[in-house]
């Protein structure tokens, strides 16, 4: 039956799309131009120092190095490191084989973090551990440094309950008789090559989730920038009044959001082609003699939760990257979250959304089966035309077109549902691997994570059996070409192998979709038989 041919076409189109997607992504990201980087943007390092403080609210735990006051480690307390781990997920860390840090400071002519100084400021604090209490609305963690000329620098970390954004506030008191000129900077640095322990699942085949740098500016709401570009010194140098800079990975992001002090500079840099840096630098900030100035910026360290990121900075929620099918993935995700709020199980929500999608496309499915039934009825006439004009292929085409017009049949009518189902399928895939809400989301029995593959491959096998059943009730006896018939008979095996490494939530969607296909096929074809 033509439906088997359609399955094969679907597979071909899907694989072709994966290859095109990988090529398109590479071409798009390589369009950046090499920029000359000012020496002030060069890598700012921190001395190895055992003096650290620990800051914690109910969702994040931070480790701050007192040299410069950089965030060297950050753990997300609401997210496990792995599915069966009791440890919280560590987003930022400083180790022997991997570095991922959020740095900030004051640079420029009079900035204590300027590269012209021998070292960065060594701050002090009145204690080592700071924890937000159960009934507290805000945790303020001040660290201080006194310069040789008497300037007092106070850097304060401000955390609020159940929030992943951290306010960084510099309070600079200038008691001297001269003005001070400096710039605030914020940058994120990360080792480009992941160690084995962090190199975990991030997608399948060509549809990998993005890991790299990103930024938002006056001209671009959201732009990704590959680590490879930074490693090869093809760096950014962008002036903008709005925006942010970030480093992204599957489900999580670290971002600096500067205060609007005028034209900020967004830049990238690298160290020995092994460490990538993206950052921003503010315009010059003047602090008059005998005066105080407050300078602020904001740091996001956490999961890519769209509704929360929207509140922190414009366009920060765009880091939840659903690819070019975002216009389908976004409403699908919103619908899925509504269903989850009612049902309380992501797996059953996926099942219900499958019924909704198949219900919406039912008119097209019905038209597909009617078109295929008419095509089957025309097979004797088509065969007669082929035999009659076997030596004239052009005449065969002309006669078949006339036959289709006479019988009022569109030979491509059976393909429309496939072109509808393919983007739905892909958008659901992007949603599953890009939405942190589905990370480690359980279903039933052995399925403990709908965003990763079935550990025992049970769902892919069930999916293959549903395809085999569809093939049996459809029958391939009408296919005259022996090679094509063998391909059709082998399709369930091909698809089963194809789906082994797909997220179990996606395989669940396809199983339910196949079951709906079986029901709809039996119903529509039985009605067609009755109406003959």
From Swiss-Prot:
Molecular function (Gene Ontology), one example: membrane insertase activity
GO CC terms in record: plasma membrane
Pfam family, any one: YidC_periplas
Principal subcellular localization: membrane
InterPro entries given in the database record: Membr_insert_YidC, Membr_insert_YidC_N, YidC/ALB3/OXA1/COX18, YidC/Oxa/ALB_C, YidC_ALB_C, YidC_periplasmic_sf
GO BP term (any one): protein insertion into membrane
Topology term for the membrane: Multi-pass membrane protein
TM ranges: 7-27, 336-356, 413-433, 450-470, 492-512
Transmembrane helix found in the keyword field: yes
Highest taxon, organism lineage: Bacteria
Subcellular location: Cell membrane
Keyword Transmembrane belongs to the record: yes
UniProt KW keywords: Cell membrane, Chaperone, Membrane, Protein transport, Transmembrane, Transmembrane helix, Transport
Cited function: Required for the insertion and/or proper folding and/or complex formation of integral membrane proteins into the membrane. Involved in integration of membrane proteins that insert both dependently and independently of the Sec translocase complex, as well as at least some lipoproteins. Aids folding of multispanning membrane proteins.
Complexes and interactors: Interacts with the Sec translocase complex via SecD. Specifically interacts with transmembrane segments of nascent integral membrane proteins during membrane integration.
PANTHER family linked to this entry: CYTOCHROME C OXIDASE ASSEMBLY PROTEIN COX18, MITOCHONDRIAL, OXA1
HAMAP family: YidC_type1
Similarity annotation: Belongs to the OXA1/ALB3/YidC family. Type 1 subfamily.
Protein name (record): Membrane protein insertase YidC
Classification lineage: Bacteria, Pseudomonadati, Pseudomonadota, Gammaproteobacteria, Enterobacterales
